[in-house]
Amino acid sequence: MVSVTRTVFGELPSGGGAVEKFQLRSDQLNVDIISWGCTITALQVKDRQGKASDVVLGFAELEGYLQKQPYFGAVVGRVANRIAKGRFTVDGKEYHLPINREPNSLHGGFRGFDKVLWTPQVLSNGVQFSRVSPDGEEGYPGELKVWVTYTLDGGELVVNYRAQASQTTPVNLTNHSYFNLAGQGSPDIYDHEVTIAADAYLPVDETLIPTGVIAPVEGTAFDLRKPVELGKHLQSYHIHGFDHNFCLKESKEKKFCARVHHAASGRILEVYTTQPGVQFYTGNFLDGTLKGKSGEVYPKHSGFCLETQNWPDAVNQPQFPPILLRPGEEYNHTTWFKFSVA
């Protein structure tokens, strides 16, 4: 059984409207999602002793989400991840996007899908959010109708993304939740054991744009096909963290993507997706300056993201999976976050 409760989370400044919170509850999970950016603000999971902790980074009040912050829990779009120099060409026409992360465009621009109010509809086992992104929003061509649906099934949170375009446009939607399976506010994720089912990854340049090479993980720090303890792994390869796309099998079917196990609590997160990639990000840009829930600060490496996605800069790299959505087609992808204990 899933229950859905609807309350007001806060009011946007200058009469911008009410932001609502939807609490989805099952016997195993409690998930809070707000209509601002379709943002997951809390996710309570039990450990092996039956004690629940909130395992996502974020804020207790709306004000936290309205300040400059690193996309905690939000849906990002129209195109998640980076587009090189904020430029791309569709049908012979060049489009220029705002450069919001020098020298590139990141996560849809200055006012991406994470910074808008969505229209909610309560379902029996979840909530669906919708919006229309107007033609030219943040420089993108065509009007885009978008639906993001969160449903709960026992220990599994399912996120479905659908979109329809009036004109050919790139589309790439993901959720940017930061997880810490020890509980948000724990200082780091070094004791998390990570597995990612990818035989290849995308090397990047100094601005985090893929070089175009699809590199085998074999014999590199990116070989996460067998479980590695994150802290020891980063140390042994002398790397400062991950912020890379891992290449999954390019089928539209549901496939296993990643597994993260926190031995001390027993919590396990498994991710399945229909997407061709996942950005594994270890919170390298977190710096402890933001005050989160219950006054916690979030230093570097205090959370990780598994952003299921198309590959970064795919609109400029024809050898990457296709990212263009044409009129009459439907963008439709699903990601499953499955929680359990061992």
Curated annotation (Swiss-Prot):
Pathways involved: Carbohydrate metabolism; hexose metabolism; Carbohydrate metabolism; galactose metabolism
GO molecular function: aldose 1-epimerase activity; carbohydrate binding
Catalytic site: 176 (proton donor), 307 (proton acceptor)
Residues modified to Phosphoserine: 14, 124
Name of this chain's protein: Galactose mutarotase
Recorded superkingdom: Eukaryota
Binding-site residues, beta-D-galactose: 81-82, 107, 176-178, 243, 279, 307
Chief location: cytoplasm
Keyword field contains Phosphoprotein: yes
Function of the protein: Mutarotase that catalyzes the interconversion of beta-D-galactose and alpha-D-galactose during galactose metabolism. Beta-D-galactose is metabolized in the liver into glucose 1-phosphate, the primary metabolic fuel, by the action of four enzymes that constitute the Leloir pathway: GALM, GALK1 (galactokinase), GALT (galactose-1-phosphate uridylyltransferase) and GALE (UDP-galactose-4'-epimerase). Involved in the maintenance of the equilibrium between the beta- and alpha-anomers of galactose, therefore ensuring a sufficient supply of the alpha-anomer for GALK1.
Catalytic function, reaction form: alpha-D-galactose = beta-D-galactose; alpha-D-glucose = beta-D-glucose
Subcellular location: Cytoplasm
Gene3D superfamilies: 2.70.98.10
Keyword annotations: Carbohydrate metabolism, Cytoplasm, Isomerase, Phosphoprotein
Disulfide bonds: none
NCBIfam families to which the protein is assigned, alphabetical: PRK11055.1 (NF008277)
Quaternary context: Monomer.
The species this protein was found in: Rattus norvegicus (Rat)
GO cellular component term, pick one: cytoplasm
Family label: Belongs to the aldose epimerase family.
Annotated Pfam families: Aldose_epim
Gene Ontology BP, a term: galactose metabolic process
Its EC number(s): 5.1.3.3
